[in-house]
Amino acid sequence: DTLNPFAVGRFGTGRVDAYAAVASSMTTWASVLSASFKDESDDGLFTPGERARISLTVRNDLAPLTNATVRVRNVPAPFAAIIEQQGGTIGAMGQGETREARDVIVVSLPDEVPFNASLDLLVEIIDNGRIVGRELISTNVNTTYRTLDRNDLAMTANSSGNLGFNDYPDNAQGDGVTYRGSRNLLFEGALMIGTAPGKLVNVARGADTDQKDTAFSTTGVIALRTDSVPSGIRAVTSYSDALDPYRVGVDVRQHLYQTADDSLRNVVLSCYDVRNTSDTTLSNVHVALFFDWDIGPNGQQNVVSWDAQHGIGRVRNVARPEFPVVGAAMISPVVTHFFAVDNDGFTTLNPGIYDNFLRGEKWLMMSSGIARTQSAATDASMVIGGGPFALAPGETRQVCFALGAGDTDSLVSKGIAAARNRARTLGLNTQTFEPAPRTSRIVHIEGGPTLTPGSTTITFSIHFITGVIIDVVDLFGRTVSELYTARDDAPGLHVATVNIPTVSGGNYFIRLRTATTTDVAPIAIVR
């Protein structure tokens, strides 16, 4: 029983009298079809020290029972419930009869219970002194996740930066994201914060895609509150990267807002107050959300796209238009970044996430501007965020996102526009969206800004077919070395392998020139 608590009461001993089992016309067996737990605070959260009443639905499967009763006991586990009322009488039951046994069991939790623990209890059905049925019933207790369900867009959030579910990839803890009672729309939602590929903390899947990165440690368990949100609720939680080996040096206080007002019934706001806990200024800070959407029965035929007019990343099932459209927008006054992901991608600039999801890939997606604007029709994800910005020691910066769903693109756009306005009313860090022209730019210099002579890679984006020249220039704008030339590069992201010249150590610029634009990035060459 200790090694297999899920099978307590199911393993027998001794010999099986097979003939008697099939020959008897009075074989008895009953089943527990369902069990419901009602905690005394009636908030759906079974917490340490709290009492709960358990109701059972019992079915008699075989021969009639004359005076059935139920009783419960603990099974081997890290903690034991305090059983205050062990069971009660159900009575006579005919073959095939189903009966409700309300509040038949009362248990309470001890004062010390692990987070997100499973309370497992063995229910035994007894008739005339003989056990005629056994069933293990379970519920999650002392949970660190909550579901906001006051409007049409219901969403679970946890206490360490995930949206949708707490326990990727099992996804048994939480309700995901649903619209008007739909099936779940989100497989994975995760916060990512970084200043460089090697300084990136997150709770998305990682090098092993069956496990998520666990950069954030809970410092305040998520709580639901009704203050500050007219006709709605908000959730508050906090967490820190202090224990992560890739730590940036931040803690986060997250606020989620949900209201039932007509114009906001299809949206949720999620804001992140990011504070620098280190003793040095953090530069190049980026904050992003990763979403692996599953719109439809199997998550296929999803297309993620960028709506440049409204500043919204959208996803829809192109084969099943009856399913909702979902949108996400970064609504704070920092530069927006967006990347549409083919989950089965395999190229440098469309790396995919089936084989792994490395920090370098996460950084590419969260810091490359409006980079990949549409996915294929496949199992698709998106990364949307904002940056760069700097944080002095102890300084806090808020980055907010609006998530919306609807039957049409128009409903999503209207909901997110209303969310921007409500965010402003609530005093959150937001701004009105103004479509910005896309510009060609240097996205990333491998190893930069301090470089040594030799090979490195430069990632750059261009927004129309154009010739491209990348060179090294000195402080007076004089060309020191030409690194890359192309006559007709296509729009999108490009990665060029270049050789940094052997020159006197000092400060220089890498310059990108197209037919209409110029961009520069400062570097230091050391020898």
Please report, for each region that a protein language model flagged, where it lies by residue.
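C-terminal subdomain of the subtilisin-like protease fold in secreted/lumenal serine endopeptidases
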Residues: D1-E50
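Surface-exposed, proline-anchored Ser/Thr-rich loop/turn motifs
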Residues: F46-T47, Q431-H463, V473-R478, G505, ...
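Intrinsically disordered, low-complexity Pro/Gly/Ser/Thr-rich segments with frequent PxxP/GP/PP motifs
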Residues: A80-V113, G385-E395
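Terminal connector regions
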Residues: R102, V106-L148, A405-G427
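Beta-strand-rich N-terminal accessory domains
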Residues: S138-R225, D261-S263, N284-V285, G299, ...
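Extended, loop-rich substrate-binding clefts of extracytoplasmic carbohydrate-active enzymes
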Residues: P197-S270, T378-A380
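Glycine-rich (often Gly-Gly/Gly-Pro-rich) flexible segments and glycine-rich loop motifs
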Residues: T281-D379
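C-terminal tail/sorting-segment detector
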Residues: E482, A496-T497, P501-R527
